[in-house]
C-alpha cells in the first residue's frame, strides 16, 4: 500500500479518514503517492526524532521528511498525539479537528509548503483552513 499509517499509542484513530485526507490533499494539489509512512506517536518519540534529525530538543506537533523531488511523493511524517491534545486544550478546539488540521499540515509539508516565513505560514494556514472545512463539513466526520 502506498500510504501506511502506524499508531504507536493507545489512542484510537479513524485511520481511513486520515488516509483519505492525506491522499486527497496531495491529489488536489497535483501530487500522487509513491510511498508515505504516517506515524502517530507520543511526545517522547517525536522529541527523540526532533533531537536526532533536526537538533531541536523539544516535542513538536509534526515532523515531516520528504525523500523525492518529483510529483509522486516518497516521504514520512510523525505526529505527536500528546502535543495535539495539549494544543487542542490550549487553543480550545476539539482534539479530532486539531488532529485533522495537523495531518493536513503534514501533507502540505510533504508537497513542499513551508511555514518558516510569515508568508509561507499564512499560505499554509489558508490551505489548512480550506481542507479542514472541506473534510470536517463535507464528510461530517472527524478522525477519531
From Swiss-Prot:
Lyase found in the keyword field: no
Subcellular location, principal: cytoplasm
Molecular-function GO terms, alphabetical: metalloendopeptidase activity; RNA endonuclease activity; zinc ion binding
Cofactor: Zn(2+)
Positions that bind Zn(2+): 105, 109, 115
EC number: 3.1.-.-
GO BP annotation list: rRNA processing
Alphabetical UniProt keywords: Cytoplasm, Endonuclease, Hydrolase, Metal-binding, Nuclease, Ribosome biogenesis, rRNA processing, Zinc
A UniProt-annotated Pfam family: YbeY
Co-factor binding comment: Binds 1 zinc ion.
Subcellular location: Cytoplasm
Gene Ontology terms: cellular component: cytoplasm
Keyword set includes Nuclease: yes
Function: Single strand-specific metallo-endoribonuclease involved in late-stage 70S ribosome quality control and in maturation of the 3' terminus of the 16S rRNA.
Matches recorded under NCBIfam families: rRNA maturation RNase YbeY (TIGR00043)
Family statement drawn from the similarity comment of this UniProt entry: Belongs to the endoribonuclease YbeY family.
Name of the protein in question: Endoribonuclease YbeY
Organism name: Chlorobium limicola (strain DSM 245 / NBRC 103803 / 6330)
Amino acid at each position: 500500500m502506498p500510504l501506511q499509517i502506524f499508531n504507536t499509542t493507545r489512542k484510537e484513530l479513524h485511520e481511513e479518514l486520515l488516509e483519505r485526507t492525506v491522499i486527497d490533499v496531495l491529489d488536489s494539489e497535483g501530487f500522487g503517492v509513491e510511498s508515505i509512512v504516517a506515524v502517530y506517536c507520543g511526545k517522547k518519540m517525536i522529541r527523540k526524532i526532533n533531537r536526532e534529525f533536526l537538533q531541536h530538543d523539544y516535542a513538536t506537533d509534526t515532523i515531516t521528511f520528504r525523500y523525492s523531488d518529483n510529483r509522486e511523493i516518497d516521504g514520512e511524517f510523525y505526529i505527536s498525539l500528546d502535543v495535539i491534545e495539549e494544543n487542542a486544550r490550549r487553543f480550545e478546539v476539539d482534539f479530532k479537528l486539531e488532529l485533522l488540521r495537523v495531518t493536513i499540515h503534514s501533507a502540505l509539508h510533504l508537497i513542499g509548503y513551508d511555514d518558516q516565513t510569515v508568508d509561507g505560514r499564512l499560505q499554509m494556514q489558508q490551505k489548512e483552513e480550506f481542507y479542514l472545512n472541506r473534510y470536517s463539513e463535507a464528510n461530517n466526520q472527524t478522525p477519531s
